[in-house]
Amino acid sequence: MDGKRNPNGYKDRLLSTRQKIIVVLVAIFLVFVGTIEVLDRLGVYSWEQLYIKFGVIDGVSKTDSNFTVYYINVDQGDCSIIVSGDDVMVIDVATISALNEVRSALKTLEVDKIDYLVLTHPHEDHIGCASTIINEYEVSNILMPKLSSINIPTTSTYEILINDIAKNNINVIQAKPDYNFMIGEAKVEIFAPLQQYEELNNMSIVMKITFGSTKFLFQGDAESEVEQALVESGVDLTADVLKLGHHGSNTSSTNKYLKAVQPKYAIVSCGPDNPYGHPSQKVLDRLNKLNVGVYSTAIHGDITITSDGKNITVLTEKTGWFIWIKIFILLIELNQILQF
């Protein structure tokens, strides 16, 4: 020994300690994964339960719930699927460019018959896949707003749709206030359109679905003029979940309307970095002030909400690595704790 101390000795020991911690964390991680695998195979605890614990799911998937609402990620458009018992209702079917997403969701849910196809209003981003869907699936009823000479569109998409509806001899129901029906054990109430509007957005079907004591409100692209009329009508707009009108645009979701609905959660259906600025920051600010939880298909992907008639559970789509990132973050946090 020359009596000289190694100036890097402490650093070496510290590095060694960190390496040991990393080894321990990796070992814990592997034991964790192995344990879940064993429990999954034994049917005791599954990866699906773990995903649900973290509030994430692998896109659209069937649930054990008697009532489930799926808000499908169709980029800049709308498509929701409601499964209530054995009944299925589809609300809007996006643009034709999202046909694969719509087909995939219906296939995953093993849908071969649609009891009600609701087309809130005849804009391309709501009816784009409608003709294809009614030609490929058994559709019992189509719910549409009654249009007039001041608002009937002249687009080829709409004209082909009308021809295909007639060709398939599908029962068409003209949506109007006070029209109610059941899907499974859920009650559907139509609140609008209230009158004829030149603006097609305001011809949107506004409807509330009630399952037990849980309520879901859909309004297509209905704007502030319709929202104001609904509030003044005195109809019960309260809902646990509000599908924001017009993709979260500032043309909808007024403060007065939001206070009437009193939602716990708001759903935005829009594409990422869309050219319309959806959802509007002003709308998000209003929701934030009212302590409303916001979920967006642009951020969260497919959104699934289940209800047992009393409580609702919100699940969002996971990417293949999402759950592992969460677990990795937990491991990093554990590492930081151990260092102190």
For the regions a protein language model found, what residue spans apply to each?
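Non-globular, low-confidence helical/coil segments that flank catalytic cores
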Residues: 2-340
